[in-house]
Every structure is written in C-alpha cells, then in structure tokens.
Amino acid sequence: MDGPDEQFMRRALELAHRGRQEGEVPVGAVVVVDGHVIGEGWNRPIAAHDPTAHAEIQALRAAAAALGNYRLTGAMLYVTLEPCDMCLGAMFHARIARVVYGATDPKKQVLKSQVKIEGGVLAAECGELLSEFFAAKR
C-alpha cells in the first residue's frame, strides 16, 4: 500500500499525463496542506504562451487562490520532475515547507551556464527605492 508521498505523486503523474495529451512536456504538480490537495497544475507554456507556466507555478497559483494568500506556509509540493531554479524561487517566496520530486532533471546543471548574470548596475538607487518602500510599510 502506498504512503502519502506516493499517493500525492500519483496525482501529480495523472496531471503530467494530461500535459502530455496537450502536447506539453509531461510534468505535473500538486500542493498539499494538512493532507489535502489545494492546488494542481501541469506544464502549459505552449498553450498559455507563457514561459513561466510550469506545473509548479500553475499549482502554486491555484493553491494561493484557494487560500486567498500567496503565503503557503507549511504546504508541501509534489512534482514529477526536479524543479528548475525559477520554480524553486517561487516555492521559497510561497514559503513551501517541503518539496518532493520524482525524476531528476538532467538539464538542470547545463542551464546554469546558459545565462550571463551581472549585478551592481545602479545598485544604490535600486537599493534605496526598496529601503524606502519597506520603511514605509513598517
């Protein structure tokens, strides 16, 4: 008999199959709180014309809408493929407590060398704007 991790991963796999039927890369994800699925998603970048429409993002958006809050503190996310950095960043901001994935993504390390990242341009002005914003909020 399957435990909870296997049960939720099986649901994510069902969603991945749905993505495959739609011609998308077959990845599915579910967000779980207190043993209940509150958000589901499958890859939709092609259909949505949206490079951020990964299964994890779709599931996070659905879960946030269900709770009326982008903070999903204590939630768990199950996904059929190891999350990319964008999705991990979204999970961090959503305060996901635990991520369980199925297959390892062999392209994950390759992608890190594809984008040149530079920082520090107008750093003082950018930092000042953020400091002023958060000072006014507190």
Task: State what each model feature region is.
Residues 2, 45-46:
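A short, polar/acidic, helix/strand-boundary loop motif
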Residues 69-81:
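Immediate flanking context of iron-sulfur cluster ligation sites
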Residues 27-35:
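Short beta-strand scaffold segments in enzyme catalytic cores
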